[in-house]
């Protein structure tokens, strides 16, 4: 995919994506908590993308990409590389169109997420846990099968699809001051920035990033993309390096990135479990962790938080396995 800015979507394409995915994607609800409002000093509106099909917002982008293909392109299938949620989303989206999906998965990926990819009907190809290995295997599959590459976060159709979550949130909750999303490769936060820019409303977009995978934060601070950071975080969905087009969109739309550590993220996840009575994954909890750590940024404001996913490995939770304290 070209990484030029003119290859990226605009608000019209986000609206087109919303119409394209409407027969397949869910309009997810918004939840509130008076306790969490009091704790943070802000009005919080949680956009429940963990209830999206496939358990994550990523179905939006994958679905838009799959249904943007011509019949001739679709007949050859799709391919991607993913450690979990995007792979499952693409597998499910491909199933809605009745086409083949190939997902390259690095060794050591979360077992429950790999199982979901298989459940949705994709062919899983395991590779070494490096970006070079992922790229090489996906390219080889594409060359052999003719399958169309759907990149997890730099594909324009994926970015447009991810932007539909913020588009819905803006429609569902009036008068928002801030929207917070997690930051990994940057598809959700850049799509959200585009949706906000096209809405005509003065809403500040903020990304929440693990301090152990702070490439987006450092890239914005230095003014150029930082590639040398080796991620060390429990947030498996946020270990990807920010994409070049995504980084450029963050700069163009004055997106701020705030850092949170894993302990803060896990504490925020527990708060969501306790107060909203919903199951979210660690990557998703970074948004509340950011509000709690950086109260001065959010206090007194109406804040939309995108709960990006709920694909938790239940085998890792003690009460689900019958383990005692």
What are these regions (language model features)?
Residues 1-325:
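PLP-dependent amino-acid enzyme catalytic core
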